[in-house]
Regions:
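Active-site histidine-acidic residue metal-binding/catalytic motifs
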Residues: 139-263
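A short, glycine/acidic-enriched catalytic loop
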Residues: 166-177, 280-306
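A short amphipathic beta-strand at an alpha->beta junction
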Residues: 99, 103-135
Length: 511
């Protein structure tokens, strides 16, 4: 602990020495209980204040509103406290981008300081944001009863929107590291939609429209447009869905319409779930996958956790992504996209387009497929009432075999692999002068054949043979290898193979 603290203090000192920002934290907030680090809290507060001030300048609002941040290191909990004057007059989503940027940046700094992943609580004048705006989703918005067959809304983030008063058409996010979030997320949503159809047998609805045909008002392809305009075209009479902020005079009021339209459309459809696909933004040091659920819907946390569980399992199984960071648990955050949805819903932040390494991953089809397979699997197993169970094979006992003998060995595993699977047995210790052959047993579907490998001794000598066996599924997920051994025994005569050895199954052989 002392070494970690010394390293953290050294890192913080170097950061603080380069910072000349003014500390604007409120002195009225009491320090949190538990282990604290004053230098870390100072750094986090300064970074949060910088982001808040930048946001208020962009919004043409006066400076002076304060924010502070502190970390309880022993509990791994960060509290971000916004002071008076920050909240809008109505719940209009105008703080979402700023709050998320603060969260992501401070989380990354805490991680760099050696604190590890932290739970983050954001308070506005001492209360959670949504507690300032009690809400209920109006029943008329859910026009279609939910069907037992299963349906889901997949919502790719952002898209072109009209800004006021000049009525220019603009993308909602700036380009960073060669990525425009508005244009890259539809490809992820396409992949996810196909997986949900093929693997989960669900009816998939889309918030944004694809295709190269032209949106008549902007004269841009429909695939570039935000959900607001697709829903206006699809449901012209439902202004309550796509024009919620009709009375707003904000320049970005159609941005706010777009955020609110997505959950309202999900409610209208009566789907069973809503999956929103985004790329993330923050300080360039922030990276990795996150999944957000709304704090007013704590039941959605399980969906967020399962989504991350299986994103991690599949992403980290791909070459080049073994150490790609995926958060351990879902984040409670106030996104309008899922706070107004009546069904389980999460916001999936696939990776950070503001981080150079993540940006490279986001443009890689291997990463895109792996991440969306994880989202689909998490949602499917959530619907099936299953949990986070990474693929793992149980221990395999060693066996003794006479020369010429063979025995089938059960490979018992836990988890939910994507079939077909292979049981892969690899030799890791072969006696000098012997020939040891690896084996692969392919199982097309659950129950198609016993989960067994055949081990064989063909040499007339006596020696121990060492093997590793693992389960490999169709998504490339590999269970950790299980070591086991076979003791080949010299003896008169030859043994007969155990009953039930299947023809065509390649045996792991030593001889």
């Amino acid at each position: 602990m002392e070494i970690k603290r010394a390293l953290r203090n050294s890192w913080l000192a170097s950061i603080l020495a380069c910072s000349s920002a003014c500390l604007c934290a409120s002195a009225s907030n009491p320090p949190p209980l538990g282990e604290t680090d004053a230098a870390l809290d100072l750094l986090l507060t300064r970074k949060a204040q910088e982001i808040l001030d930048t946001h208020r300048l962009r919004e043409s609002k006066p400076l002076g509103a304060s924010v502070s941040a502190s970390v309880d290191i022993s509990q791994r909990k960060m509290v971000i406290r916004f002071g008076p004057g920050v909240l809008p007059l109505e719940d209009d989503h105008s703080l979402e981008e700023m709050e998320q940027y603060v969260r992501n940046t401070l989380e990354a700094y805490a991680l760099q300081a050696g604190v590890g992943e932290v739970e983050i609580v954001v308070l506005y004048e001492g209360r959670l944001y949504w507690e300032h705006f009690p809400r209920s989703v109006f029943a008329p918005l859910q026009a279609v009863p939910r069907q037992a067959g299963g349906s889901v809304l997949v919502s790719a983030s952002h898209g072109l929107l009209r800004t006021h008063p000049g009525l220019q058409w603009e993308f909602q996010r700036p380009e960073r590291n060669g990525i425009l979030e508005d244009l890259i997320t539809p490809g992820y949503a396409d992949e996810l939609a196909q997986l949900l159809t093929d693997r989960a047998n669900l009816t998939v609805h889309r918030a944004r429209r694809g295709g190269n045909d032209i949106h008549p008002d902007s004269m841009r392809p429909w695939k570039e447009m935000s959900a607001r305009y697709h829903l206006k075209n699809l449901l012209p009479e439902r202004t309550d869905i796509w024009h919620h902020f009709a009375n707003s005079n904000r320049n970005d009021r159609e941005v706010l319409d777009d955020i609110r339209a997505r959950p309202y459309y999900a409610n209208h459809l009566g789907v069973d779930g809503m999956l929103s696909i985004h790329t993330n933004a923050g300080d360039p040091v922030a990276r990795g996958s996150r999944v957000h659920y709304h704090p007013s819907k704590p039941g959605d946390r399980l969906l967020a956790d399962l989504t991350l569980c299986y994103m991690r399992e599949i992403i980290n199984s791909q070459d080049g992504y073994v150490e790609f960071p995926v958060a351990r648990s879902g984040v409670a955050a106030g996104h309008g996209e899922n706070s107004f949805a009546t069904m389980p819903s999460v916001v999936v932040e696939v990776a950070f387009h503001t981080n150079a390494a993540d940006a490279v991953a986001l443009q890689d089809p291997v990463f895109r497929t792996a991440s969306m397979k994880g989202v689909e699997k998490g949602y499917r197993l959530f619907r099936e009432g299953k949990g986070c169970v990474p693929l793992k094979a149980e221990p395999i006992d060693g066996i003794h075999l006479p020369a010429g003998g063979a025995q089938q060995v059960d490979v018992v595993f836990e988890g939910y692999p994507q079939y077909p699977i292979e049981l892969v047995t690899t030799n890791v210790g072969c006696p000098p002068g012997w020939k040891c052959t690896d084996s692969r047993v392919r199982i097309e579907r659950p129950g198609a054949k016993p989960s067994q490998v055949t081990l064989r001794c063909e040499n007339t000598g006596s020696a121990p043979i060492y093997w590793n066996t693992q389960v490999v599924d169709d998504d490339g997920v590999k269970s950790p290898p299980v070591p086991h051994w076979v003791q080949c025994i010299r003896g008169p005569g030859s043994a007969v193979a155990s009953p039930g050895v299947h023809a065509g199954v390649e045996a792991a052989t030593a001889g």
